[in-house]
Amino acid sequence: MLTAVYPGTFDPITRGHEDLVRRAVRLFDRVVVAVAESRNKRPFFSMDERVAMTREVLADVPQVRVEGFSGLLIDFVAEQGAIAVLRGLRAASDFEYEFQLAGMNRNLKPDIETLFLTPSEQYMFISASMIREIAQFGGDVTPFVHPLVARRLSEKIREN
């Protein structure tokens, strides 16, 4: 079974993330969406909230499993029995960092490849941080996220 891991903070999961996963399942038998703990960032949603939202958004895709993780990504990928790490590249500016990360991961685990997918055109400009900012200022995020995510964003903003 060919397995890939698609890691990210998914804070929150966007239509761009969702699109990449739905395209990836055409390439792999199974895709593990790995929701990162993200110690260096201060996530808007907790790990449990991000995992739950991501599971709900992708519930209709049987080849997808959503898991939270902390620690080294490449170790998590190996534990999943995956052959590849999937990364999305929205712009050339993403490439430099992703290229370095891919090189380090290859050095640590030479048998695991990194594959880059570009987003579908309508999602190239979407980022989770932009979505959060738009939502916090009362803007409409429904074109950019699943309705469940839009609802959770507004609930979370009201709580804070």
UniProtKB/Swiss-Prot annotation:
| Pfam families in alphabetical order | CTP_transf_like (PF01467)
Q: Which SUPFAM superfamilies match?
A: Nucleotidylyl transferase
Q: Which UniProt keywords apply?
A: ATP-binding, Coenzyme A biosynthesis, Cytoplasm, Magnesium, Nucleotide-binding, Nucleotidyltransferase, Transferase
Q: Spell out the subcellular localization from the entry.
A: Cytoplasm
Where is substrate bound in this sequence?
A: T9, K41, L73, R87
Q: Name one GO molecular function term.
A: pantetheine-phosphate adenylyltransferase activity
> What EC number(s) are associated with this protein in UniProt?
2.7.7.3
Write down the required cofactor(s).
Mg(2+)
Functional description taken from the UniProt entry: Reversibly transfers an adenylyl group from ATP to 4'-phosphopantetheine, yielding dephospho-CoA (dPCoA) and pyrophosphate.
Protein's UniProt name? Phosphopantetheine adenylyltransferase
Q: What is the lineage of its organism?
A: Bacteria, Pseudomonadati, Pseudomonadota, Betaproteobacteria, Nitrosomonadales
